[in-house]
């Protein structure tokens, strides 16, 4: 006679084991209709699963994230159902959920086309609209294997053979004639799976191993209702317009080419943005009392073996040989900073030492993962390492957190997700060291009143880390900043200081980056601003144009006055109509367009327009100079006249 405790604290007693769905029905017909699954004592269960003992129960509906994740997982099975009907010889591999959607890896003897995706999507909708029930059957390991052997599904058999214990009882989900295997839960009926879209096909190796067969990965998105799907697809369209690769080409910021995969060729305008970011961060380094250093690009293998990078990070390191010595190009800056710390005796009175570098790093990322500026092989980190005592950890981490929020707010990022990544399986150092490091970061977050999500096993091999992810205007998340606590690396490289009792102690090292990769951060803000950079970042801050040749000298005078004041200003004296010039520079997203006609010359003024078409009227040269200098100096996000 199970007693079921509901979220409001009320209890219901039943005479016999009862399913999640039947409990929902006992509460109300509306809840039963909305029930996708249940959370029994915190564990997700199918709506058909029986509750046999006293339990806490929450009904999962499409209104919550868990419900949406289950809908997406069931849409992956629906895709399997449809593709088996259209391509009976296809072999099914895996079909998990991902952020905003799902995918299914399939083995098919021909490449899928856009026409195939359209046909699959149509068949999925036809099947879903029959609103068939999804039937769950828990079977023995052998029965599951026999089922997939009879159906000619080698990948499912491999999963059973390699990943599932023979004593286990796998769940098979029946979608009419189609059968799939899954931990679940899944929707009880396909009426929940009407709002989806297949997005693309890509290649993917079985088990993610390049030695295995290349499969075809079909990506899809799924939502709880038509409105959510429509809004998501609209966001995707907007994201495509904002793609930093397109904007980067249109604005002539940078390019990449096959001869240097994952390496950026910065053009003048892109490099201007890069240098402005460096200048901005440098002002903050001074404000937060950092010293700036520069370490070598390449160091001997012996050093990387001492740090543990060679053993734990070797696959991502570029190496070279010279004069019978093996070197690695640095993937990160920390070992070099320890070498600088080690020069000269340090006392506890010298600590904390905050050491910053715009470090040029290289990582041998897989070619398939490279993506514009977002995933590169050569990048610059706004990196810093703080050498401190254990007593200083909390105050130093707190200062790092303050600096992170200070810098992000300048770019208009206010929605920041905080995550604490704990010890990975592959790591250096004793568990006691990791306990202290994780507790230290958690305490700093709590004392600063920050809510955070724990990411088990996602820390660096040498220490746990706080990650700061930016949520952009399209609701996408970008991981940028990190604060990592490291009790291991300084000791491995013999770093020490003289403590108050005259004993030698090993300093704690705090690794911190805020922008992260500057290349990636430029990609992020390019998409966030859609190329409409604020005036302080814009490569050209104002363009000065004449209407006829007679105004050329005045234009040059205006340009010289503004340029001499340190502003980035150009002239456009071409023999073109003024409307043509305005359209061209609007497309180039130049913040301000200054038009000089005879009336403006007579009054000693300029007519000012913004790139979004606002006519701001006329200003004297000195008035406009003061306005633009103030915007640049205070790093304002909006132009004059913008809300």
Swiss-Prot record:
The keyword NADP does not apply. SUPFAM superfamilies: Class II aaRS ABD-related, Class II aaRS and biotin synthetases, TGS-like, ThrRS/AlaRS common domain. Its EC number is 6.1.1.3. Transmembrane segments: none annotated. One of its GO terms (cellular component) is cytosol. It holds the Pfam family HGTP_anticodon. Binds 1 zinc ion per subunit. This is Threonine--tRNA ligase. It comes from Pasteurella multocida (strain Pm70). The gene is thrS.
């Amino acid at each position: 006679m199970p007693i079921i405790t509901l979220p409001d604290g009320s209890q219901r007693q039943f005479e016999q084991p009862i399913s999640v769905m039947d409990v929902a029905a006992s509460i109300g017909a509306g809840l039963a209709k909305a029930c996708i699954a249940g959370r029994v004592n915190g564990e997700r269960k199918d709506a058909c699963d029986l509750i046999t003992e006293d339990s806490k129960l929450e009904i999962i509906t499409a209104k919550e994230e868990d419900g949406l994740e289950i809908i997406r997982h069931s849409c992956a099975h629906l895709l399997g159902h449809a593709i088996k009907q259209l391509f009976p010889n296809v072999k099914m591999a895996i079909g998990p959920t991902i952020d905003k959607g799902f995918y299914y890896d399939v083995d098919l003897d021909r490449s899928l086309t856009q026409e195939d995706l359209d046909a699959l999507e149509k068949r999925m909708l036809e099947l879903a609209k029959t609103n068939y029930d999804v039937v769950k059957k828990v079977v023995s390991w052998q029965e599951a294997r026999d089922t997939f052997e009879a159906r000619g599904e080698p990948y499912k058999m491999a999963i059973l053979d390699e990943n599932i214990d023979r004593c286990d009882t796998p769940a098979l989900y029946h979608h009419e004639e189609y059968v799939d295997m899954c931990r679940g839960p899944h929707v009880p009926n396909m009426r929940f799976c009407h709002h989806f879209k297949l997005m693309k096909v890509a290649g993917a190796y079985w088990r993610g191993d390049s030695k295995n067969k290349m499969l075809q990965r079909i990506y899809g998105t799924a939502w709880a209702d038509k409105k959510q799907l429509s809004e998501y697809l609209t966001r995707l369209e907007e994201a495509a317009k904002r793609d930093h690769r397109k904007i980067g080409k249109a604005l002539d910021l940078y390019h990449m080419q096959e001869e240097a995969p994952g390496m950026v060729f910065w053009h003048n305008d892109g490099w201007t943005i890069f240098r402005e970011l460096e200048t901005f961060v440098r002002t903050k380094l001074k404000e937060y009392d950092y010293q700036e250093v520069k370490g070598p690009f390449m160091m001997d293998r012996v050093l990387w073996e001492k740090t543990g990078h060679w053993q734990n990070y070797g696959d991502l390191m570029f190496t070279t040989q010279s004069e019978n010595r093996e070197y690695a190009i640095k993937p990160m800056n920390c070992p070099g900073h320890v070498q600088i710390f080690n020069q000269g005796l340090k006392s506890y009175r010298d600590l904390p030492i905050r050491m910053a570098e715009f470090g040029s790093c290289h990582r041998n990322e897989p070619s398939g993962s490279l993506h514009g500026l977002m995933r590169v092989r050569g990048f610059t980190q706004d990196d810093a390492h703080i050498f401190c005592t254990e007593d200083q950890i909390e105050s130093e981490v707190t200062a790092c957190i303050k600096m992170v929020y200070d810098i992000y707010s300048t770019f208009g990022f206010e929605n920041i997700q905080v995550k604490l990544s704990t010890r990975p399986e592959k790591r250096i150092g004793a568990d006691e060291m990791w306990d202290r490091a994780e507790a230290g970061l958690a305490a700093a977050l709590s004392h600063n009143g920050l809510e955070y999500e724990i990411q088990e096993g996602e820390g660096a091999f040498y220490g746990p880390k706080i990650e700061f992810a930016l949520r952009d205007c399209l609701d996408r998340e970008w991981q940028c900043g990190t604060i990592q606590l490291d009790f291991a690396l300084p000791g491995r490289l013999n770093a020490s200081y003289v403590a108050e009792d005259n004993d030698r102690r090993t300093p704690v090292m705090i690794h911190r980056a805020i922008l992260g990769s500057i290349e990636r951060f430029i990609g992020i803000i390019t998409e966030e601003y859609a190329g409409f950079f604020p005036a302080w970042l814009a490569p050209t801050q104002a363009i000065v144009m004449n209407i006829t040749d007679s105004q050329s000298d005045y234009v040059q005078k205006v340009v010289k006055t503004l340029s001499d004041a340190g502003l980035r200003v150009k002239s456009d004296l071409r023999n073109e109509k003024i409307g043509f010039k305005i359209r061209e520079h609007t497309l180039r997203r130049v913040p301000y367009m200054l038009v000089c006609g005879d009336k403006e010359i007579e009054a000693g003024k300029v007519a000012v327009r913004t790139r979004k078409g606002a006519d701001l009227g006329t200003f004297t040269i000195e008035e406009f100079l003061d306005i633009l200098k103030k915007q640049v100096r205070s790093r304002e996000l909006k132009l004059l006249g913008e809300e």
